[in-house]
Amino acid sequence: KPVIFDGDTGGKIEHFVFTVRTLERLGISAVIIEDKVGLKQNSLFGTDAVQIQDTIEGFCNKIRTGKNAQVSDDFMIIARIESLIAGKSIDDALARAAAYVEAGADGIMIHSKNKSGDDIKEFCQRFRVANVSTPIVVVPTTYSHITETELASWGVNVGIYANHMLRSAYHSMVNCAKSILMNERSQEAVNEYCM
């Protein structure tokens, strides 16, 4: 199975070269880097976390540098576009997508905190008119009501379900801890909550 690494912003350009070569050597299939600058902040935190995008030129330079550092043609660099998170337009996201693909990005990830998913749908459909082959990646955390079949009909190739397995495990962990505390032993917890 392919393994995709979350590379955050990719760091400084000179560090991204090292990251690409290291990931390739480890057998990782792809890295996703986001077009933000500054310290790492979750894109879904809302308006309290200010998202600052890199310039198109700066991010294209990072993509080109990463592609030039690759040893094999198999490794993919996927550009994550934060325009919709930052409150910018779909047109801005599309302009960035076109520039990033031109710079060598092997895929485009579009991100949004809009619960309807309408902006993602419009982006994907408009991007597909101009570019039929570049993979589109989405993370449908906030628009979780949309099915994979619908996403595929928009032109989406990959859906990432970010930390859903971990988040679903918390409920069982809390119940397990409560059982141990209530029973002053683990026997009941093992029988009920453990595999």
Language model: regions and residue ranges:
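Alpha/beta enzyme core
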Residues: K1-Y161, S168-H171
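Extended, intrinsically disordered, low-complexity segments
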Residues: H164-M195
